[in-house]
Design a protein with these regions (language model features):
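Extended hydrophobic
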Residues: 44-122
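Aromatic-residue detector
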Residues: 12-14, 70, 80, 127-130
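Amphipathic alpha-helical effector-binding/dimerization core
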Residues: 1-37
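Glycine-rich, flexible loop/turn motifs
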Residues: 1-3, 7-9, 31, 40, ...
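Basic side chains
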Residues: 4, 20, 79, 113, ...
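Cysteine/selenocysteine-centered motifs that mediate thiol-based redox chemistry or coordinate metal-sulfur cofactors
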Residues: 33-40, 121-132
Length: 132
């Protein structure tokens, strides 16, 4: 699995698990502005979602499930799962993800990774709450 992350490399919100989590939990007017005014959609792989309506549906699903998935949408052979870190008294403060070879992120493996990340998100949220 020859995948390397380049420090400082950026990617659009709509095609990464971290970005999709950020989109899903931003205020609805910000999401609309992003989808209709701010972004020029680029297809990175045949799986990249570039239609605003599909991305709105994806955001709703992410809010419902509590995690996002990048299904090789930014890079072939790489899948990612992302979760938000939310504080009840504020807006989203962080997000984090796990990435790996697509073969390691299917079916129950994907659900297990999402569950582990959600547990870590809860712990981070509790720690941030004690610091506030």
């Amino acid at each position: 699995f020859p995948y390397r992350t380049i420090i400082g490399e950026t990617a659009p919100l709509y095609c990464t698990s971290l970005g999709k989590v950020m989109m899903a939990f931003m205020p609805s007017e910000e999401l609309e502005a992003y989808l209709t005014q701010s972004v020029s959609f680029h297809t990175f792989t045949r799986y990249t979602i570039t239609e605003p309506d599909r991305l709105r549906q994806e955001a709703a699903l992410i809010r419902e499930k509590g995690f996002s998935v990048d299904n090789e949408e930014h890079e072939y052979g790489v899948k990612c799962v992302g979760v938000p870190v939310l504080l009840p008294e504020s807006s989203q403060v962080a997000a984090f993800s796990a990435s790996g070879p697509a073969s390691a992120f299917d079916g129950s493996d994907l659900e297990q990774k999402a569950k582990a990340l959600k547990e870590a998100s809860f712990l981070m949220r509790e720690r941030l709450r004690t610091l506030a």
